[in-house]
Amino acid sequence: MATVKVTLIKSMTGRIPNHKLCVKGLGLRRIGHTVEVQDTPENRGMINKAYYMLRVEG
């Protein structure tokens, strides 16, 4: 299965609680942290919800 690199580029402070949970669900902890996640519909949904805080490659 394909993977996607996701990087947190903006702070989670003051964001919508559900968007914070999506970022945590992707495994991101701090600004500049990058993780590789499987390209599944579930992960795509979390990425799409919090897109304004993330950089996605691949």
UniProtKB/Swiss-Prot annotation:
The residues forming the signal peptide are: none
Record gene name: rpmD
Lineage start: Bacteria, Pseudomonadati, Pseudomonadota, Gammaproteobacteria, Pseudomonadales
Keyword annotations for this protein?
A: Ribonucleoprotein, Ribosomal protein
Which family does the record claim for this protein?
Belongs to the universal ribosomal protein uL30 family.
**Cellular component GO terms, alphabetical:** cytosolic large ribosomal subunit
Organism, as annotated: Pseudomonas fluorescens (strain SBW25)
One Pfam family here: Ribosomal_L30
| Gene Ontology MF term list | structural constituent of ribosome
What are the transmembrane regions?
A: none
Instruction: Name it.
Output: Large ribosomal subunit protein uL30
* The UniProt record lists the keyword ATP-binding: no
State whether it acts alone or in a complex, and with which partners, per the record. Answer: Part of the 50S ribosomal subunit.
Tell me, which GO biological process terms does this entry list?
translation
Q: Which PANTHER family match?
A: LARGE RIBOSOMAL SUBUNIT PROTEIN UL30M, MITOCHONDRIAL RIBOSOMAL PROTEIN L30
